[in-house]
Amino acid sequence: MNGQRYRETPLDIERLRRLNRATVERYMAMKGAERLQRHSLFVEDGCAGNWTTESGEPLVFRGHESLRRLAEWLERCFPDWEWHNVRIFETEDPNHFWVECDGRGKALVPGYPQGYCENHYIHSFELENGRIKRNREFMNPIQKLRALGIAVPQIKRDGIPT
């Protein structure tokens, strides 16, 4: 472009922010079998995952096929899952949003007794032109253990002021 640098106008930035926010709102509103189409909200090589795992390493699913298979597993294991108390926070970057919310639903994970999960979540969404590039999910892993019927160890907090 003749060495000229493209600069977005404030109006362009606001349009992009609204487009990206609508995608985040759609993602958070999906329930039940509708979640089976959630991968379509991502760029082709987009990724999503849980950043609070027992290994200490994120569990990441990359690309539409991997995200589709994850959605199928989630539909089987958490069939009535829903996000609620959703609060979406915009940042200075129109391509990055944070979400704070609660999640709840039956936990039917193979190898564990049927349970019910309620947890508090933080999501980071990085987007590109209305499509998700990366979604990182953070939650309290202790609540996940309880939902799966796994005994939770007690942490001694001697000396902590109350």
UniProtKB/Swiss-Prot annotation:
InterPro entries assigned: NTF2-like_dom_sf, PhzA_PhzB
One of the protein's GO biological processes: phenazine biosynthetic process
Annotated signal peptide: none
UniProt entry tagged with the keyword Translocase: no
Pathway(s) the chain acts in: Antibiotic biosynthesis; phenazine biosynthesis
Keywords of the record: Antibiotic biosynthesis
Induction summary: Under control of LasR. In liquid cultures (aerobic), phz1 operon is induced by quinolone signal via 2-heptyl-3-hydroxy-4-quinolone (PQS). In biofilm (microaerobic), phz1 operon is not induced by PQS, because the biosynthesis of PQS by the monooxygenase PqsH requires molecular oxygen.
Gene3D superfamilies (alphabetical): 3.10.450.50
Domain of life, source organism: Bacteria
Function comment: Involved in the biosynthesis of the antibiotic phenazine, a nitrogen-containing heterocyclic molecule. PhzA1 (operon phzA1B1C1E1F1G1) has a role in the biosynthesis of the phenazine during planktonic growth.
Entry similarity comment: Belongs to the PhzA/PhzB family.
Protein name per Swiss-Prot or TrEMBL: Phenazine biosynthesis protein PhzA1
Name of the encoding gene: phzA1
